[in-house]
């Protein structure tokens, strides 16, 4: 029940506007690396010193105007340049709705290609985040178009979707770099597993499918059972460490992140920054409602 409440709140535009004005003091600092690229760089440097790599994400989705989409696109280019300038072990992640997908596919494609051009210039990899199901087909279509132009481009497949395995198979000709996740949006039972067990079993089958195809696989999870499954799979099939990595979110299980890195696994931390943090934060609380305590602490400190 709480999960559905927080997912509903994540889509509330009034609350998003209020939270943006109030700042990350509402407990979000645990999960967000600050408002600026400078704060994100500082965070990633600290992670790199601990043996962790990163993917930087400028928070924002559902751009309501070309001006907003243009601003996010420019910030993405700025982030790429910062990654190169500071020699960070980091990639860039972005959401297509943040660069205008809801306004027009042409606008989003134009911005994405411009961002990828800068990324290619600085040799920085980029991952297109997957959003809710209403944007699923467009995201895969745009990924297919741009993957052929930019080799170091990845995208995300959500394990809670019934169709995920078929979509991975359809992409094999692209040799896709995929981040596999459980999925964090509220979706209908018509398209997504409604229960954790179904999602987890499907997640394991997707990891196996992607890894055994020989394509790069990022297993994005905080679940020890999924981590254990992946470790056993790569050991059994002698899959090289260069073909996969684990990913976790900034602020969640930081000690486990360090443990995996010390064990010799490539461990990437998803590092978001920016003022448009509310929707992201609500989805993190929906995944683990106990995190709501940090909201209360943030308010009580005022």
From Swiss-Prot:
Record: residues binding substrate: 95, 283-284
Domain of life: Bacteria
Family: Belongs to the proline oxidase family.
EC numbers: 1.5.5.2
Cofactor: FAD
GO biological process: proline catabolic process to glutamate
Residues binding FAD: 130, 158, 182-184, 221-222
Entry protein name: Proline dehydrogenase 1
SUPFAM superfamilies linked: FAD-linked oxidoreductase
A Pfam family hit: Pro_dh
Keywords tagged on the record: FAD, Flavoprotein, Nucleotide-binding, Oxidoreductase, Proline metabolism
Catalytic activity as recorded in UniProt: L-proline + a quinone = (S)-1-pyrroline-5-carboxylate + a quinol + H(+)
Pathway assigned to this chain's UniProt record: Amino-acid degradation; L-proline degradation into L-glutamate; L-glutamate from L-proline: step 1/2
Gene: fadM
Record-annotated site: Critical for catalytic activity: 270
Catalytic residues (positions): 129, 179
pH-dependent activity: Optimum pH is 7.5-8.
Protein purpose: Converts proline to delta-1-pyrroline-5-carboxylate.
GO molecular function, one term: FAD binding
Temperature dependence: Optimum temperature is 25 degrees Celsius. Loses 70% of activity upon activation at 45 degrees Celsius for 15 minutes.
Highest classification ranks of the organism: Bacteria, Bacillati, Bacillota, Bacilli, Bacillales
């Amino acid at each position: 029940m709480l999960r559905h409440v927080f997912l509903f709140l994540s889509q509330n535009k009034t609350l998003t506007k209020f939270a943006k004005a109030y700042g990350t003091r509402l407990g979000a600092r645990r999960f967000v690396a600050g408002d600026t690229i400078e704060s994100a760089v500082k965070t990633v440097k600290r992670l790199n010193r601990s043996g962790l790599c990163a993917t930087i994400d400028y928070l924002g989705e559902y751009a309501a105007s070309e001006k907003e989409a243009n601003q996010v696109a420019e910030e993405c280019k700025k982030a790429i340049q910062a990654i190169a300038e500071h020699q960070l072990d980091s990639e860039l992640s972005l959401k297509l709705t943040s660069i205008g997908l809801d306004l027009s596919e042409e606008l989003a494609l134009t911005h994405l290609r411009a961002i990828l051009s800068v990324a290619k210039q600085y040799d920085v990899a980029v991952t297109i985040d997957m959003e809710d199901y209403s944007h699923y087909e467009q995201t895969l279509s745009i990924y297919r178009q741009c993957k052929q132009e930019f080799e170091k481009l990845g995208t995300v497949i959500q394990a809670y979707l019934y169709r995920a395995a078929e979509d991975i198979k359809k992409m094999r000709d692209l040799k896709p770099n995929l981040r596999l996740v459980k999925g964090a949006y509220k979706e209908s039972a018509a398209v997504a597993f409604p229960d954790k067990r179904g999602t987890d079993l499907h997640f394991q089958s997707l990891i196996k499918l992607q890894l055994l195809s020989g394509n790069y696989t990022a297993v994005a999870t905080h679940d020890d059972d999924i981590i254990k499954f992946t470790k056993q799979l790569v050991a059994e099939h002698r899959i090289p460490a260069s073909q996969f990595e684990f990913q976790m979110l900034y602020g969640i299980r930081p000690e486990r992140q360090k443990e995996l890195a010390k064990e010799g696994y490539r461990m990437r931390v998803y590092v978001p920054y920016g003022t448009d943090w509310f929707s992201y934060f609500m989805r993190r609380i929906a995944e683990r409602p106990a995190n709501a305590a940090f909201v209360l602490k943030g308010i009580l400190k005022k």
